[in-house]
Amino acid sequence: MELDYRRLGKAYRAQHIQLSGELIMNDLEIFFYENPGNEINKWMHYFEIYDRYFSKYRGTDVHVVEFGVSQGGSLQMWKNYFGDKAKIYGIDINPLCKQLEEDQIEIFIGDQEDRKFLKSLGEAIPRIDILIDDGGHTMSQQINTFEEMFPYIDKNGVYLCEDLVTSDWQKHGGGYKKKRHLHRIQ
């Protein structure tokens, strides 16, 4: 596979180039670079983490929930990665995201701040094997989503919350002096 190495950051190149000079990428990274569909917004270091924890679900009837639909590209990536048996659920506050539904991909419209919505979502989805919180990124959204959705995750499932750094940002309702700061949750 030919890549434009200018698109890859120095740290990323160093991390993925073996002594032979060969660039090694997992299937998610390859999909990201060859993506024929909708835009995908992901930090590059997540792909290795995804593959490490999600690969055991490939080719199974996995149920994946992702908060934060945006352009829908990551939902298409999950569909491609997990295969024909997978069921992908996207959750977003923007009603226009509903237009991104396709075979194997269902989208729910609602607010991550709304605990009633989250509870109804957990009841509406028959099973959750993987939940990815890449939604609004405010501390309260991350905490509400975890508290309301974690009980619905399969006992052997995976709960992955992205961009926790925003919990330290005041503009996202965070800050280390806040009573509900993530470091204080035990």
Language model regions located:
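A short alpha-helical cap/connector motif
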Residues: 1-132, 136-161, 165-186
